[in-house]
């Protein structure tokens, strides 16, 4: 057997490979047959796996290990098999397994079900929250979305966070509205004695319903008929009753200045206007009261002179002027108290001497002017040119 092998090797030229292993059945050992089967399986691997292994290229007829019997046989003839022995020492490492990249979600699920836990936390979070978002859009989410709490501090539900932020903003807005209402309500809580003394806070102008009450309809059928022969007091009292006008002295001045006949004619015109729907005020927000309609017709009647109208409303305009002056004085008094309180809380040591002196002089002048306004009790009466015309007698009640 050895002589045949040598003879065949002698026939092979340098650089050629011997096919003795394929021509001679049974010549190889079981280890060599196993190596052949391994070579066959390696040849069927994907081309991508062989590239990604990163090992240098080797001839395909190489063996993984050298058998001791083969080494002893090859050592007997060093000259003929030296090149073969060197080539047998090259090892063919098995290429590393390179799994293809999962292109779809089903592959990832299969990998996760295979026993290996995939560390894809944010992918799971995104999937859960997308499901919650879809359920919310469909309107089938009647409760808070359940989220996996196994991640503890890494758990974050952006839908729940948005809901909580919205609730916090609504709560803050309600709190601000409540504080504003309390502030406005406290502003109106002033005692009458303090208002008379000018020591209370300003009271805001009341609404129309608070000042005028519910609108009363005109009483078309009075208590009795009135004529020019009746006295002025009787005519004025009946007109005030039918108009539901509380200011009877104003109606009495109207009857006295323009006469009983003209006053009764204006009453009939007022009844006709009220039956047709009434009159609106200038801005159109509400209808005039029957007394307001009566006074409006009085001012717009050409036969009534302007001097007569000024004489009728002189006392009312004078009261309104005094009320405005008193309101202005009260505002100045409240402002002075706030200024004094603010000055006491200032720390003027932080500024230089010149700034402190200037501030002190300006403050003293302002406080002195406030004291002068508070001490002055004499009010000059208005001239006829300063009289303010009004549309409704009820609008004179400012406070």
From Swiss-Prot:
Entry-linked Pfam families: PHAX_RNA-bd
- Listed InterPro entries: PHAX, PHAX_RNA-binding_domain, PHAX_RNA-binding_sf
Q: Which domain of life is it from?
A: Eukaryota
Entry's Gene Ontology cellular component terms: cytoplasm; nucleus
Q: Where is the composition biased (Polar residues)?
A: 37-53
Regions of biased composition (Basic and acidic residues) lie at 1-10
User: What function does this protein fulfil?
Assistant: Probably involved in protein and RNA export from the nucleus.
UniProt-recorded name of the protein: Phosphorylated adapter RNA export protein
The species is Gallus gallus
